[in-house]
Amino acid sequence: MSLEIVILAAGQGTRMRSALPKVLHPIAGKPMLGHVIDCARQLQPERIHVVIGHGADLVRERMAADDLNFVLQAEQLGTGHAVAQALPFLSADQVLILYGDVPLIQLDTLQRLLAQVTPDQLSLLTVDMLDPTGYGRIVRDDQGAVQAIVEHKDATPAQRQIGEINTGILAVPGKRLADWLGRLSNDNAQGEYYLTDVIAMAVGDGLVVASAQPLDAMEVQGVNDRMQQAQLERHYQRLRAEELMRQGVTLLDPQRLDVRGEISVGRDVLIDVNVVLEGRVVIEDDVRIGPNCVIRDSVLRRGAVIKANSHLEGAELGEGSDAGPFARLRPGSVLGARAHVGNFVELKNARLGEGSKAGHLSYLGDAELGANCNIGAGTITCNYDGANKFRTELGDDVFIGSNNSLVAPLKIGDGATTAAGSTITHEVPAKNLAFGRARQKNLENWKRPEKIKK
């Protein structure tokens, strides 16, 4: 059967106390709405319709994609009214209704829900709660069949004792939806058009109302304030940490890892505390990551080591290479096999060949280094003239003395050496020694200045 999905994302989120629309607040670095859309896409629907209201332009701008149809709900008059805004665009056999502020919903749960939908049967997602205050209750008959959903404010004292609640997630036969929505009334305590009233209508029309429950109740936890957002963030991170450990990663403290992207890991990886992984990160076998590191959109080849307090973005570390502590590798940085970048070294768009080393206190930008080069402490590539960037190219086996300024554009040949304290402005041929400093002079019997007596 064909499927279309409606995601309700029009709410203001007053309790978030933010100018940002609630559904754009992040979980693991991605807008909550983005998590819901990603899950919805895995169901391969004909179309995904996103109902927007508060902050509509910003939501549309941030989440724009070819497979999304944004539908405006100018006035927020309830969930039933919100779904009705998408009716002109719906033609599928099944319609699944999701929520942009319920970001942890899982594919397996939705598949089980949809499997129960037929032309004469709809299915809703429920969950049992110890404290169901504020939620709509699932009312069943003596045989256990769902009869209705009663919102908390409209519930009788007896109905408020019910622990099974409505999550709001619902899958219905598409051809029935327009009729039900057209019959909704706002004659209730909230003065809104409740989507949940569809359940009683379906029962009255002789349809069966099936139900399913998620394996983890946190899947259907919504976000209304910053505390709930933080709860879901930690729960999500716990799930990601457990997933990594099942794949053979040792986490010294699973509660002190943040994963904010798509991570691929090998076996026997060790990750210390307070590590943040963002974007697309590939970590091969036997990699070691020290504490307090941030790694974004990077590739760590087999046996690479990242030492404490290092920051990598758009970088690649070759097999057996290492960086840190306190190293910064910016986009375009590549370390060859067994290359080494030490403390307080910054690379930007720089490649170090196999076995090359920059041990400490250096900046290498827009540079290409061959194999087995040694960069002395305090060396910088002067790559910017205030208007344009220029490259520095070193051959194999180059030795750069300490405290060198390499003024680009510059080429230094294989096996060349530069003296400590040099400013190198011209090409250095292979196997040459280059001095780029003033000759030392010693003044005999020099007397230091004395303070003037006042």
Curated annotation (Swiss-Prot):
Which residues of the sequence carry a binding annotation for Mg(2+)? 101, 224
Give the matching InterPro entries.
Answer: Bifunctional_GlmU, GlmU-like, GlmU_C_LbH, Hexapep, MobA-like_NTP_Trfase, Nucleotide-diphossugar_trans, Trimer_LpxA-like_sf
A Gene Ontology cellular component where this protein is annotated is: cytoplasm
* Cofactor(s) annotated in UniProt: Mg(2+)
For this UniProt record, the keywords arranged alphabetically read as follows: Acyltransferase, Cell shape, Cell wall biogenesis/degradation, Cytoplasm, Magnesium, Metal-binding, Multifunctional enzyme, Nucleotidyltransferase, Peptidoglycan synthesis, Repeat, Transferase
What are the GO BP annotations of this UniProt entry? cell morphogenesis; cell wall organization; lipid A biosynthetic process; peptidoglycan biosynthetic process; regulation of cell shape; UDP-N-acetylglucosamine biosynthetic process
User: Where do the segments described as N-acetyltransferase lie?
Assistant: 248-454
UniProt region (Pyrophosphorylase), positions on chain? 1-226
What subcellular compartments does it reside in? Cytoplasm
CDD domains (alphabetical): GT2_GlmU_N_bac (cd02540), LbH_GlmU_C (cd03353)
Q: How is the cofactor bound?
A: Binds 1 Mg(2+) ion per subunit.
Name any one GO molecular function: glucosamine-1-phosphate N-acetyltransferase activity
Q: Where does UDP-N-acetyl-alpha-D-glucosamine bind?
A: 8-11, 22, 73, 78-79, 99-101, 136, 151, 166, 224, 330, 348, 363, 374
Principal localization reads cytoplasm
Question: Could you say which residues bind acetyl-CoA here?
Answer: 377, 383-384, 402, 420, 437
> What does the annotation say about its assembly with partners?
Homotrimer.
Name under which the protein is recorded: Bifunctional protein GlmU
Q: What is the protein's species of origin?
A: Pseudomonas aeruginosa (strain ATCC 15692 / DSM 22644 / CIP 104116 / JCM 14847 / LMG 12228 / 1C / PRS 101 / PAO1)
The opening ranks of the lineage are: Bacteria, Pseudomonadati, Pseudomonadota, Gammaproteobacteria, Pseudomonadales
